[in-house]
């Protein structure tokens, strides 16, 4: 009797080990598939960005190329629905197409998928472009929580505060940006404009372009 009980116990342990191993294999397989999907999706995003760069070589931008880029970005999202870079680039394309509402939706989705400092900079920027400094300030502050050493987030915060006519706070934000990055020329230009009395839309500059590899 004891022998039978022991055999049953060992069988159950072996079964549990086998089930656990299968689970680990399934997780590893799923992770591998997700990584492969992201790589394929990123490759399509890169193709789309080349089209956007080509579109920007004409003035006004070549809308046919922008539409082609948007088709590729949608394809990238179908491959990997969590590719935040595709949503960021779609937001840029909708901005070029002067569809601010949809652009905001794209940038907001990017922050939901990946709440990085850079994505919140993009969201703050589009809010500023559509004349919504309140939400721009919220986006900048959310980004600062995620990336407190990002000077460009403080520059975006300063822009939002400037548009809200909270000039003292805008000055503090730009000074903070310069402490974090003394070479952030746009923050210095914004601070100089504020100190010279040039306030309001059009007297301060947007955040600077992203590093090489980004679209804007």
Segments and roles (model prediction):
Residues 89, 122-123, 156, 190:
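Canonical tetratricopeptide repeat
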Residues 29-74:
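N-terminal leader/linker segments that initiate helical-solenoid repeat arrays
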Residues 38-40, 171-216:
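Terminal, low-structured helical/coil segments at or just beyond the last alpha-helical repeat
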Residues 55-56, 77, 111, 144, ...:
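A conserved position within tetratricopeptide repeats
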Residues 38, 81, 114-115, 148, ...:
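Short coil turns that delineate tetratricopeptide repeat
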Residues 59-75, 96-109, 130-142, 164-176, ...:
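Structural signature of tandem alpha-helical TPR/SEL1-like repeats
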Residues 41, 84-85, 117-118, 151-152, ...:
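Helix-start (N-cap) detector for alpha-helical repeat units in TPR-like alpha-solenoids
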């Amino acid at each position: 009797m004891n022998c039978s009980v022991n055999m049953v116990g060992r069988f159950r342990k072996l079964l549990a080990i086998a089930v656990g191993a299968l689970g680990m294999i399934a997780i590893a397989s799923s992770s591998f598939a997700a990584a492969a999907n992201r790589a394929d999706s990123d490759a399509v995003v890169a193709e789309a960005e080349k089209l956007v760069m080509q579109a920007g070589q004409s003035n006004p931008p070549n809308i046919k190329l922008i539409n082609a880029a948007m088709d590729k970005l949608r394809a990238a999202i179908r491959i990997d629905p969590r590719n935040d870079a595709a949503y960021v680039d779609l937001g840029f394309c909708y901005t070029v197409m002067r569809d601010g509402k949809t652009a905001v939706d794209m940038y907001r989705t990017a922050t939901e998928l990946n709440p990085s400092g850079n994505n919140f900079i993009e969201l703050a920027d589009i809010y500023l472009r559509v004349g919504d400094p309140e939400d721009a300030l919220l986006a900048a502050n959310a980004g600062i929580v995620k990336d407190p050493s990002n000077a460009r987030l403080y520059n975006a915060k300063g822009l939002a505060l400037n548009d809200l006519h909270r000039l003292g706070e805008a000055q503090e934000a730009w000074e903070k940006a310069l402490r974090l990055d003394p070479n952030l020329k746009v923050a210095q230009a914004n601070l100089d404009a504020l100190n010279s009395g040039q306030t309001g839309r059009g007297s301060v500059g947007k955040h600077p372009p992203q590093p090489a590899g980004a679209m804007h």
